[in-house]
């Protein structure tokens, strides 16, 4: 391990032990704000500290084992042990590098997930319903809460478009690579001759912005229209102008919400989605401008992004970005998405690592 990284880790280790001591101090315990702040920092450092301690223990074992090489009787055993320890150390060093990667500040945020049917007509809308159920089930596995913000039903089933708010720590970080085009290849229920059709849905995942960011929006940039709800709502449907449509004039972004009976609640929801979209667009443009010449696995949520193909006849799911193929379509649609999500996150981390050769701790 390079000396600069060792210094960085030693510094973090000292800070970890310092906080550990402070958290048992009565003065700190009595100060709730300080205690909470230190607890959060302690939690952030715990994984990197654990890996560093493991690395130091492993390094100590290497030094001890090298001494055994001088013993002719133990030489072969010691050599095998050194090979095992060397592999273990390299694995720990890789884990440490990943833990020291620059964090996306939005990764721990809640997110909005939007699904829009694209090419394929009714079949695309039906598949958007399949994707919606897939993400809802995955959210349930993660113990995240979901709340539908807006949806437009399709006559043959599914949705023309649907927006869901997903609340749970790390939901954006886990789902952000879902943004892009999702293509389905199957025989539609409406197909009488058994021909396979290809349809596409577009998924966009954006972080929910804090309330203070929403308050900064210039009201003069917004056009707010109210109209009568056309969705569920019992006797209140079509009797009051509770539905809200907000247009951000400079960007042309439009968000509708008619899920709530209250116009005020619909407006708050629509505004939250709108501002999150605007901020996400700004982040994308910044990322595009500052990007080093490397592939960007994080999609834009545009039709041009081709993420996955779901082939029903072959029970196959293909992630085109990393050439990953799995034959468990039923399980994937049942919400068991980690088989696709974890590899793309690992690939992204590997890409970032390969471009961090000049970072301060390497």
Curated annotation (Swiss-Prot):
Free-text function comment from the UniProt entry: Peptide chain release factor 1 directs the termination of translation in response to the peptide chain termination codons UAG and UAA.
Organism superkingdom: Bacteria
Classification via HAMAP family: Rel_fac_1
Record localization: Cytoplasm
GO cellular component: cytoplasm
Organism: Buchnera aphidicola subsp. Baizongia pistaciae (strain Bp)
Molecular function as annotated in GO: translation release factor activity, codon specific
PROSITE patterns reported in the protein's UniProt record: RF_PROK_I (PS00745)
PTM section of the record: Methylated by PrmC. Methylation increases the termination efficiency of RF1.
PTM sites of type N5-methylglutamine: 235
Name recorded for this polypeptide: Peptide chain release factor 1
């Amino acid at each position: 391990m390079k000396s600069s990284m060792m210094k960085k880790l030693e510094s973090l280790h000292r800070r970890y032990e310092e906080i550990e001591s402070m958290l048992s101090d009565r003065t700190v315990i009595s100060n709730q704000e300080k205690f909470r702040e230190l607890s959060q920092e302690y939690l952030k450092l715990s994984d990197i500290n654990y890996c560093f301690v493991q690395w130091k223990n492993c390094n100590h074992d290497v030094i001890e084992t090298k001494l055994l090489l001088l013993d002719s009787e133990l030489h072969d055993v010691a050599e095998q042990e050194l090979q095992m320890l060397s592999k273990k150390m390299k694995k720990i060093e890789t884990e440490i590098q990943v833990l020291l990667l620059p964090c996306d500040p939005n990764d721990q945020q809640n997110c909005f997930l939007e699904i829009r049917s694209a090419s394929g007509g009714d079949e695309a809308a039906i598949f958007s319903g399949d994707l919606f159920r897939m993400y809802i089930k995955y959210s349930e596995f993660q113990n995240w809460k979901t709340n539908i913000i807006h949806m437009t039903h399709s006559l043959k089933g599914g949705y023309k478009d649907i927006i869901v708010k997903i609340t749970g720590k790390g939901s954006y970080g886990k789902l952000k690579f879902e943004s892009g085009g999702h293509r389905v290849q199957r025989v539609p229920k409406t197909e009488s001759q058994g021909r396979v059709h290809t349809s596409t849905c577009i998924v966009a995942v954006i972080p929910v912005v804090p309330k203070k960011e929403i308050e900064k929006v210039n009201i003069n940039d917004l056009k707010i229209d109210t109209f009568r709800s056309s969705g569920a709502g019992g006797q209140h449907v079509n009797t009051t102008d509770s539905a809200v449509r907000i247009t951000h004039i400079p960007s042309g972004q439009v968000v509708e919400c008619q899920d709530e009976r209250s116009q005020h609640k619909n407006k708050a929801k629509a505004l939250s989605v709108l501002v999150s979209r605007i901020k996400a667009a700004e982040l994308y443009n910044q990322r595009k401008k500052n990007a080093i010449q490397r592939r960007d696995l994080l999609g834009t949520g545009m039709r041009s992004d081709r993420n996955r193909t779901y082939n029903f006849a072959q029970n196959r799911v293909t992630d085109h970005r990393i050439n990953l193929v799995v034959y468990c379509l039923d399980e994937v649609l049942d919400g068991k998405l980690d088989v696709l999500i974890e590899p793309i996150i690992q690939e992204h981390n590997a890409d970032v690592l390969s471009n961090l050769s000049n970072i301060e701790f390497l």
